[in-house]
From Swiss-Prot:
It is found in: Cell inner membrane. InterPro entries: AAA+_ATPase, Alt_ATPase_F1_bsu, ATP-synt_VA_C, ATP_synth_F1_bsu, ATPase_a/bsu_AS, ATPase_alpha/beta_chains, ATPase_F1/V1/A1_a/bsu_N, ATPase_F1/V1/A1_a/bsu_N_sf. It catalyses: ATP + H2O + 4 H(+)(in) = ADP + phosphate + 5 H(+)(out). Keywords: ATP synthesis, ATP-binding, Cell inner membrane, Cell membrane, CF(1), Hydrogen ion transport, Ion transport, Membrane, Nucleotide-binding, Translocase, Transport. GO terms for cellular component: plasma membrane; proton-transporting ATP synthase complex. It comes from Chlorobium luteolum (strain DSM 273 / BCRC 81028 / 2530) (Pelodictyon luteolum). Its main location: membrane. GO terms for molecular function: ATP binding; ATP hydrolysis activity; proton-transporting ATP synthase activity, rotational mechanism; proton-transporting ATPase activity, rotational mechanism. This is ATP synthase subunit beta 2. F-type ATPases have 2 components, CF(1) - the catalytic core - and CF(0) - the membrane proton channel. CF(1) has five subunits: alpha(3), beta(3), gamma(1), delta(1), epsilon(1). CF(0) has four main subunits: a(1), b(1), b'(1) and c(9-12). Belongs to the ATPase alpha/beta chains family.
Length: 468
């Protein structure tokens, strides 16, 4: 390297404030999103976010800044943050830089692609609406997911979001034979290790990739790990022509990391302290999730709702991108109904007769009506007792209670905890079971016989299981 090129590629640290680092370059300024390296062994990675003037840039450190000092040399790599792509990354676990964190050797012969990419143009996108069948009764029946769409799992802490996501991975591999990519944003180290071991024990690790920006890592790492996972998903969709299930846990922590960066960059906060660019940043991630003529990326995103407040700006902005929303209820979880999805608070734009068919559409409306009427009658039952209802209302309550129990389901990923073998149920079997319950074919069966089963044919075998 000649002297001129050396001076052109190197700058000096001018200022350090937490994870925000200002760097001075004498001859040129690196473009936005360029990765800079500094530190004793170039272990500190900085992404350029803005150019302050003709000599200074301001960037966010994607690693810890311990050991940095003013006037330290900074290398302009000339490249953006990149992620490895290729079939060799299957069954592996990576960090935001594409480095293995599963104690294995780096995968050989991978291609590296920049994580900052444009969404597919409208001309390449498929306009056909297709249902993505999950094998989970309450989702496929009442809130069907869209192939190439985005679904949100809304709920507070401890209601089963992560368990539901891991079950989706299992069913994706066994039902659709596609690729699953799990992106952990702000995940606890323990949860990542448990997921890795669960997927390995379930035999689905060979068809999935895991990418983590862990809770203890700087906000820059948590803010970019979603783009790294999405870049990997785009490879399987566009180059391998496969369907991809992208699971993000938790999209709120992506927004939270952006809020931390915004504060450190000195931006004026908006409502409730969120960054003013939250809508734009979320759109840059969400708009790349789409289906094309060659494949589809279907995304399911866990959304932590602060204090269970669905008017929180993070929840509101996320809602606008979703084709389906699955709301997990703490009350239902407390009553033992798992998955704890609230059928009256969840919904999907796919529930139209032109998409799911008239039979499915009419049945879903009838079930919602029965469950809504039962919800209204609960206060009367609590005050006066079931005997004070009319005969017709008592029949309605019995149907609703049987439907609630039938829509529970044992999961493969929780077999070791529940002792009940997991079930994957087809949509036709779910529709058939609900229609038979509404026709009172199981009026003489105890409610417990319908609790935690797959198809209604198992009702006789499950009489010993006690429902809540």
């Amino acid at each position: 390297m000649d002297t001129a090129d050396h001076h052109q590629r190197y700058g000096r640290v001018a200022r350090i404030r937490g994870s925000v680092v200002d760097v001075r370059f004498e001859r040129h300024l690196p473009p936005i999103h360029t990765i800079l390296e500094t530190g004793k062994d170039r272990e500190v990675k900085i992404e350029v976010l803005t150019q302050l003037d003709d000599r200074h840039i301001r960037g966010i450190a994607l690693t810890g800044t311990e050991g940095l000092c003013r006037a330290m040399a900074v290398l302009d790599t000339g490249m953006p943050l990149r992620a490895p792509v290729g079939k060799q990354i299957l069954s592996r676990m990576f960090d935001v830089f594409g480095r293995p964190i599963d104690r294995g050797a780096p995968p050989p012969d991978v291609e590296w692609r920049g994580v900052h990419r444009m969404p597919p143009p409208l001309g390449r996108r498929s306009t056909r609406s297709e249902v993505f069948e999950t094998g989970i009764k309450i989702i496929d029946l009442l809130s069907p997911l869209e192939r190439g769409g985005k679904a949100g799992l809304f709920g507070g802490a401890g209601v089963g979001k992560t368990v539901l996501l891991t079950e989706m991975i299992h069913n994706m591999v066994h039902r659709h034979h596609g690729v699953s990519i799990f992106c952990g944003i702000g995940e606890r180290c323990r949860e990542g290790e448990e997921l890795y071991r669960d997927m390995r024990d379930a035999g689905v690790l060979d068809s999935m990739v895991m990418v983590f920006g862990q809770m203890n890592e700087p906000p820059g790492s948590r803010f970019r790990v979603g783009l790294a996972a999405l870049t990997m998903a785009e490879y399987f969709r566009d180059d391998q022509h496969e369907d991809v299930l992208l699971l993000i846990d938790n999209i709120f922590r992506f927004i939270q990391a952006g809020s931390e960066i915004s504060g450190m960059m000195g931006q004026m906060p908006s409502r409730l302290g969120y960054q003013p660019t939250m809508g734009t940043e979320l759109s840059q991630l969400e708009e790349r999730i789409a289906n094309t003529g060659t494949g589809a990326i279907t995304s399911i995103q866990a959304v932590y709702v602060p204090a269970d407040d669905f008017t929180d700006p993070a929840a509101v902005h996320t809602f606008s991108h979703l084709s389906a929303s699955l709301t997990l209820s703490r009350k239902r979880a407390g009553e033992g109904f798992f998955p704890a999805i609230d059928p009256l608070q969840s919904g999907s734009k796919m529930t139209a007769p032109s998409i799911i068919g008239r039979r499915h559409y009419d049945l879903s409306r009838q079930i919602r009506r029965v469950l809504a009427q039962y919800s209204e009658l609960k206060d009367i039952i609590a005050m006066l007792g079931l005997e004070q209802l009319s005969a017709e209302d008592r029949k309605l309550v019995a149907r609703a209670r049987r439907l609630e129990r039938f829509l529970t389901q044992p999961f493969f990923t929780t077999e070791q905890f529940t002792g009940i073998e997991g079930r994957m149920v087809s949509l036709n079997d779910t529709i058939d079971g609900c229609e038979r319950i509404l026709r009172d074919e199981f009026a003489d069966y105890p409610e417990s016989s319908l609790y935690m089963i797959g198809t209604v044919a198992e009702a006789r075998k499950n009489n010993a299981v006690h429902a809540p």
